[in-house]
Swiss-Prot record:
Region spans: Interaction with host APOBEC3F: 14-17, 74-79
Protein name: Virion infectivity factor
GO cellular component terms given for this protein: host cell cytoplasm; host cell plasma membrane; membrane; virion component
Known partners and oligomeric status: Homomultimer; in vitro and presumably in vivo. Interacts with viral RNA and Pr55Gag precursor; these interactions mediate Vif incorporation into the virion. Interacts with the viral reverse transcriptase. Forms cullin-5-RING E3 ubiquitin-protein ligase complex (ECS complex) by interacting with host CUL5, RBX2, elongin BC complex (ELOB and ELOC) and CBFB/CBF-beta. Within the ECS complex, Vif interacts directly with host CUL5, ELOC and APOBEC (APOBEC3F and APOBEC3G) substrates.
Record flagged with keyword Membrane: yes
Remaining remarks: Vif-defective viruses show catastrophic failure in reverse transcription due to APOBEC-induced mutations that initiate a DNA base repair pathway and compromise the structural integrity of the ssDNA. In the absence of Vif, the virion is morphologically abnormal.
Length: 192
């Protein structure tokens, strides 16, 4: 019998990000109880030797599975030391890979209260509005002008520690272009 290959999208990440992600997931599962129903699986619960952990997030009938890997081939960067993350959406026998932004959006829609467009209508009608979203990573667009005005008027409290974000987990902060300030703002550019 011939070998059959299966292609899987794996986002290369720093191992410290994986450790942070796992500790945030465990904190919100066991201490804050905000990740209710989430299941964390250790590496010894998996049959695959390269899987270091799995997080199963129920989304109604479907579920999101975030797997972290170790011992992969190293990447082109120094910090690509063979660690990665795959994100899978599964419904019964159907499964597909999703990107981190969509994964965060799905988690946001299913689990967390949000200060959204409905809050603007409530504020106009005179109801008390709590201007905070528990899961900011689930927003992938800029809000309307009224939304921005309401958020500027009443500052939201930040939850500590933050909720685990898939986008933050796979974020490539090393390859982002550096932001340099002008001549006045950056002291190294003007010699002081």
């Amino acid at each position: 019998m011939e070998n059959r290959w299966q292609v899987l999208i794996v986002w290369q990440v720093d191992r410290m990000k994986i450790r942070t992600w796992n500790s945030l997931v465990k904190h919100h599962m066991h201490i804050s109880r905000r990740a209710n129903g989430w299941v964390y699986r250790h590496h010894y619960d998996s049959r695959h030797p390269k899987v270091s952990s799995e997080v199963h997030i129920p989304l109604g009938e479907a579920r999101l599975i975030i797997k972290t890997y170790w011992g992969l081939q190293t990447g082109e960067r120094d910090w690509h030391l063979g660690h990665g993350v795959s994100i899978e959406w599964r419904l019964r026998s159907y499964n597909t890979q999703v990107d981190p932004g969509l994964a965060d959006h799905l988690i946001h829609m299913h689990y967390f209260d949000c200060f959204a467009e409905s809050a603007i209508r409530k504020a106009i009608l005179g109801y008390r509005v709590s201007p905070r979203c528990d899961y900011q990573a689930g927003h992938n667009k800029v809000g309307s002008l009224q939304y921005l005005a309401l958020t500027a008027l009443i500052k939201p409290k930040k939850a500590k520690p933050p909720l685990p974000s898939v986008s933050k987990l796979v974020e490539d902060k090393w390859n982002k272009p550096q932001k340099t300030r002008g001549r006045r703002g950056n002291h190294t550019m003007n010699g002081h």
